[in-house]
């Protein structure tokens, strides 16, 4: 097994000193690079002041500051922020918010989720149900019902049957529309 000892910028360095590009950005969590001193300093300062506190019925200055910054760059009309602890938790929360919204607006049958083949959404039970990578899911099936997949929309995977990227984009959008119509527009809550 390869042992990764450290990282610098976009590189991982193994126990033999070999450098490789971190193509997954630390599983999508290190998208600005490893070993950033300014981030370590900010994390240390915040940890010494308030390392963790749940936001259930409470707030703290840094959460308020971040929420205000996000709202300032969000599309018009978006005025609320919901913080989660990570990617899979964010997916689970978004799915639950969609289901709750439709129940509260008199559409309780809108519970189904459509996602793309080969998409990765996390390893928690619900997020894994939406994930489109069969090898990740097989040992845990059956998973949450009411999840459906459509073809991936990456142009580089399209093959030669499409003359232009626009042709492929229209084809991919049509697959989503077909899935919604097949499952029933009154039953689909979200598309991931």
Feature map (PLM): residue ranges:
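Glycine-rich loop-to-alpha-helix module at the N-terminal edge of alpha/beta enzyme cores
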Residues: 19-107, 114
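Residue-level recognition of short loop/turn positions
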Residues: 15-16
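Short helix-terminating capping/connector loops at secondary-structure junctions
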Residues: 77, 105-110, 143, 185-187
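PLP-dependent aminotransferase-class I/II
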Residues: 117-192
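Short, small/polar residue-rich loop motifs at catalytic or cofactor-binding pockets
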Residues: 4-8
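A residue-level signal for beta-strand positions that form part of recognition/binding surfaces
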Residues: 9, 20, 146-147
């Amino acid at each position: 097994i390869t042992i990764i000892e450290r990282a610098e910028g976009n590189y991982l360095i193994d126990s033999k000193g070999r450098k490789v590009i971190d193509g997954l950005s630390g599983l999508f969590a290190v998208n600005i690079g490893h070993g950033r001193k300014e981030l370590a300093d900010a994390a240390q300062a915040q940890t010494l002041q308030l390392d963790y506190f749940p936001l259930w019925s409470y707030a703290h200055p840094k959460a308020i500051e971040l929420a205000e910054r996000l709202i300032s760059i969000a599309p018009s009309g978006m005025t609320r922020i919901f913080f989660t602890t990570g990617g899979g938790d964010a997916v689970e929360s978004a799915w639950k918010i969609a289901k709750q919204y439709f129940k509260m607006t008199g559409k309780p049958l809108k519970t189904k989720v459509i996602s793309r083949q080969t998409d990765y959404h996390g390893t928690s039970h619900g997020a894994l149900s939406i994930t489109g990578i069969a090898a990740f899911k097989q040992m845990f099936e059956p998973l949450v019902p009411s999840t459906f997949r459509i073809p991936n929309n990456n142009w580089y995977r399209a093959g030669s049957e499409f003359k232009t990227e626009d042709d492929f984009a229209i084809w991919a959008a049509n697959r989503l529309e077909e899935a919604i119509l097949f499952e029933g527009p009154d039953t689909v809550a979200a598309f991931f």
